[in-house]
Amino acid sequence: MGEEIKYSRFVKTDYQQYQKRLQQETDILAEWFSNNALSKKGLVAGYELEAWLIDSNASPCPRNEAFLQRANNPYLFPELAKFNIELNVEPQSINSSLLSDFEKQLQQLWQQCKQTSKDIGCNMLGIGILPTLTNNDLSLDNISSLDRYRALNEQVLRHRQGKTIGLNINGNEHLEVERKDVMLEAAATSLQIHLQTPQDESVRYYNASMIVSAPLVAVGANAPFMFNKDLWYETRIPVFEQSVDIGGIGGAASGPMHRVTFGSHYARESLLECFNENLEHYPVLLPVTYDTEPEKLNYLRLHNGTIWRWNRPLIGFDDDGTPHLRIEHRTMSSAPSMVDNIANIAFYYGLVHYYATCIDPPEARLTFAETKDNFYRSAQLGLNHRVIWPDGNRYTIKELVLDSLLEEAQTGLDKLGISAADSQRYLGIIESRIESEQTGTQWQRKFAELNGRDMQRLTRCYYQHQQNNIPVHEWDFDCSGPHIA
């Protein structure tokens, strides 16, 4: 969904033609899998970070078009709402300095974004859900002025046959709201970690990504509040799942195949299973026309981009044109500081490599149903919720991280060749965060407990701390720092 489209109005024949081409491209991909023709290149890392533009009142600042024009940076992109943007980095092969390189690149890009946002009368903020966000902020007046977003909105409503889109979230409190557009999706901003894998290793990495999603969603949580309600430990999860809920083939909006999903099973033989599932169970959402040869897989890739698995397989191409597989891990919020984002990335890469390469595959010892339940319960309940692990025992997320996962992540990073200094630094941040139980979510909840449910004050204090780029476990509740301009 990151690519602009040409759009006017879709008619029945557009869907028929798109479906035909989607079948053709899925067949081509199946042939590539069968012939082992996908890239055998070593692991390649990358990530995307979604962020907010806010004004001097800590409310959304819907000026991403002016921001992007002024920044003139190919690594910055618009998002669904005019007050959101996305930061990208250049993917790179995993090497000893990967993590520190990522941090330097992110710091440089973030500094440019901060200055550019000030130049247009806004400020930059990284957070999972903006606490000051209101339902009125999510009006269609604030949808980004790109055809793909207008088309997405119209097509989601078309598939819902005009029925409103609603949130019904039970957490510490209850939130129920309905809208006639897809703008609820813009409430949730995330860190999306990419890992390109060789074809013959992709099943293990994909399944490992699913298994480690439960601890990662809790460790990286930074979104407890939505519309002044304290909901899940990571409220992004139900918000995003419900905001584009149109179901699968036949319009079964309450059926088993949701557009935003944890998935329906582990990968068994290959990641082709996900693309076959896309073809068979998900109706075409954006039936645009491309003037490209089928081997570019434009139709397949766009269709896959309108299905938001929390661990999403992607097809791309190496510089020499060889098709490759990537896994996009989408469970974690945009973090309280840039160094927290890199620590989260380190924890993911270390854990996923450890579990993808261990001799005894963990997916053979933990059912998919257990893995899925672990994920949703962790997203709702956080660090002190118990999950079942492949060894057959139950642990709280806190126990699991401190007693085994940090050591396993360290082993994984060592095997990847990450420098000891970097792995110790970033995993040390995770360790301190979990020992103190001060995740982004917990800091926000504690602030509200100490100061009342004043979302503007909370956001101002959060913004002040974010300017210092110190990890969230070191944050206090003193708001005497630099104010939002």
Which residue stretches match the model-derived regions?
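Phosphate/nucleotide-binding catalytic core
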Residues: 1-485
